[in-house]
């Protein structure tokens, strides 16, 4: 029997990068956006998304895909977008990524997919991969194409996931698809981890995250929030409840430069500052914000650091109405670890960057009032291959400040102590030690994924690790079933 399918497929010629120039979605003017916390980039209009997608050169070896941690099938969904086959584009995109619309917003594409786009290397300007990725999945949400998970089989085994950040959420979704009963435990009152409390609204509006967590909840995943392992239930009790455990707590301990010997209250870690700002945006009452301690309004703010977290802090301070905002970084602009796009946005919004600058002393009476700094120059490369900053003699200066925010990265908390589980082995960096063949920790049936294994990293790496650990847990639980069957038969 012949079945006629009424499908209109637009035959689109790709490789249009020579005739169509690169265009980004429109961005709110800096004077306007610096006064609110709304997302600053608009979505592509349909025609513009199709045009920009058609610029893809459909490389035989797609370096954009190679350099994406998830190895997303980027050329395929670009071609489908150009052909107005958007639902198929979403299906391809979501087959390798649990949160494409989030990655499209916050991934540093200039260091990953777009930074390795072949047509960028030939001077034509990269394909706007991130913006198209965001457009595809935002459209999928609007059109109702994203449905709750309906496993083909429901299994009796349960998996406990400790941590509701990117790695934990990705692992939970993949395991739920396989039919396992999933419970996610998180210390905070909302699921999402740093997606909710660490990343400002102007980069990632919270509704984008909460619709993802609601989708998991609607799909049968149970969330237990305000839950502290070791207090509400012991780690051993969780192991008895579940057939497997995933630890995906992330890394929340802030690094500091040990200059605050006088414990000035107006020297604060980045995450504390950003969490307060995000909670205020969520209409929570935050006493330290209301008192002015974590509010940059009318203050001379100094942020120490050069990564994406530092950029989040300086741009938040601008929006809170800071008098001045300075960013101190010990290397130059070209050697900053964060996204260059975020640096440019911060410059447009009035942030004063002090490159090659190192704070050496915090000074004040009851509160910090001044920061003593020295200027640096880049010397020979160190063991990491980066040029080592060296102090220039007699270059000391004094900067006035009412608030210093230290954005120097994150370290793991002491989980064996927090969980009262001494058999959890850690590395010399404090991250959980795992067998990289299966991501299992030193405790049988307990796996780990995300930053708590690899150290502070990108959301996209957390998603990848969550997907990977889900596959290993599935294998582990299947082997246990087979093992138990053999024991019964014997």
Language model: regions and residue ranges:
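Beta1-alpha1 glycine-rich phosphate/pyrophosphate-binding loop at the start
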Residues: 15-42, 71-83, 92-94, 121-130, ...
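Immediate flanking context of iron-sulfur cluster ligation sites
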Residues: 43-62, 86-112
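A structured beta-alpha segment of the ubiquitous adenosine-cofactor-binding alpha/beta core
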Residues: 45, 218-239, 286-293, 356-402
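FAD-binding core/adjacent interface of flavoenzyme oxidoreductases
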Residues: 77, 102-105, 110-162, 223-299, ...
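FAD-site-proximal beta/loop scaffold in flavoenzymes
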Residues: 263-298, 382-456
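Long hydrophobic segments that form regular secondary structure
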Residues: 298-331, 397-403, 410-411, 429-430, ...
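A conserved FAD-binding loop/helix module that cradles the flavin
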Residues: 313, 452-477
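Active-site-proximal substrate-binding core of FAD-dependent oxidoreductases
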Residues: 336-339, 474-490
């Amino acid at each position: 029997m012949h079945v006629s399918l009424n499908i209109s497929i637009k035959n689109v010629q790709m490789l249009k990068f020579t005739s169509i120039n690169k265009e980004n979605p429109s961005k709110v003017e800096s004077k306007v956006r610096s006064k609110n916390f709304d997302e600053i980039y608009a979505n592509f209009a349909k025609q513009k998304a199709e045009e920009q997608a058609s610029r893809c050169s459909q490389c035989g070896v797609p370096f954009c895909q190679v350099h994406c941690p998830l190895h997303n099938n980027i050329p395929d969904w670009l071609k489908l977008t150009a052909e107005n086959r958007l639902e198929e584009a979403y299906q391809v995109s979501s087959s390798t990524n649990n949160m494409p619309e989030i990655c499209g917003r916050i991934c540093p594409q200039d260091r990953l997919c777009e930074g390795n786009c072949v047509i960028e290397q030939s001077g034509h300007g990269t394909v706007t991969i991130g913006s198209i990725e965001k457009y595809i999945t935002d459209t999928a949400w609007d059109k109702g194409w994203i449905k709750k998970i309906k496993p083909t089989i429901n299994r009796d085994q349960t998996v406990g996931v400790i941590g509701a950040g990117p790695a934990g959420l990705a692992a939970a979704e993949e395991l739920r698809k396989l039919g396992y009963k999933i419970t996610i435990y998180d210390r905070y009152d909302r699921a999402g981890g740093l997606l909710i409390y660490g990343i400002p609204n102007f980069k990632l509006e919270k509704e984008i995250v909460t619709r993802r967590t609601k989708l998991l909840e609607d799909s049968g995943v149970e969330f237990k929030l305000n839950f502290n392992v070791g207090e509400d239930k012991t780690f051993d009790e969780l192991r008895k409840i579940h057939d497997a455990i995933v630890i995906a707590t992330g890394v929340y301990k802030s690094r500091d430069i040990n200059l605050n010997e006088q414990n000035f209250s107006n020297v604060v870690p980045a995450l504390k500052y950003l969490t307060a700002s995000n909670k205020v945006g969520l209409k929570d009452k935050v006493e330290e914000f209301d008192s002015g301690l974590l509010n940059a309004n009318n203050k001379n703010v100094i942020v120490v650091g050069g990564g994406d977290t530092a950029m989040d802090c300086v741009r938040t301070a601008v929006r809170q109405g800071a008098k001045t905002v300075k960013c101190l970084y010990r290397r130059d602009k070209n050697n900053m670890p964060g996204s260059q796009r975020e640096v440019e946005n911060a410059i447009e919004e009035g942030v004063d960057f002090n490159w090659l600058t190192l704070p050496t002393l915090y000074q004040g009476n009851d509160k910090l009032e001044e920061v003593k700094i020295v200027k640096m120059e880049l010397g020979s490369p160190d063991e990491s291959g980066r040029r080592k900053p060296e102090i220039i003699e007699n270059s000391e200066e004094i900067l006035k400040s009412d608030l210093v925010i230290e954005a120097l990265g994150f370290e793991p908390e002491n989980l064996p102590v927090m969980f009262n589980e001494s058999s959890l082995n850690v590395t010399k960096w404090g991250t959980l030690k795992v067998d990289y063949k299966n991501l299992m920790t030193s405790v049988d049936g307990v796996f780990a994924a995300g930053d708590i294994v690899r150290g502070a990293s990108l959301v996209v790496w957390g998603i990848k690790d969550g997907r990977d650990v889900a596959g290993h847990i599935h294998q582990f639980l299947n082997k246990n079933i087979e093992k138990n069957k053999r024991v019964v038969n014997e």
